[in-house]
């Protein structure tokens, strides 16, 4: 049975209900969800503080963090990069399959 992580985001007056398909070797989906939520909330906080940051600069910042994390992990860097690319692709598919509901005045 595939592990799925229910997740909700609010973006531009839309409530988006998602179900992320997790990697088969995911050890604890609750922790994955909590860490993802904390990271998203922290990014939102940073975006408010640095309101002039571009999407490109934000993505570059995230790439630096991910590259650093991959480098210090005990796994083969190339395999980790391939896994990361696949997880991103799968995550985008899951987001595109999310259920969108308008919030407030539509």
Where are the regions that the model predicts?
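Solvent-exposed interaction surfaces and binding hotspots enriched for charged
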Residues: 1-106
């Amino acid at each position: 049975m595939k592990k799925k992580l229910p997740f909700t985001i609010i973006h531009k007056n839309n409530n988006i209900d998602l179900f992320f398909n997790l990697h088969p070797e995911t050890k604890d989906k609750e922790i994955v969800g909590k860490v993802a939520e904390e990271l998203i909330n922290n990014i939102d906080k940073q975006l408010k503080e640095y309101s002039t940051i571009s999407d490109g600069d934000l993505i570059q910042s995230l790439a630096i963090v991910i590259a650093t994390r991959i480098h210090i992990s005990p796994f083969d860097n190339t395999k980790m990069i391939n896994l990361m690319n696949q997880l991103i692709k799968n995550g985008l598919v899951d987001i595109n399959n999310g259920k969108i509901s308008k919030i407030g005045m539509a």
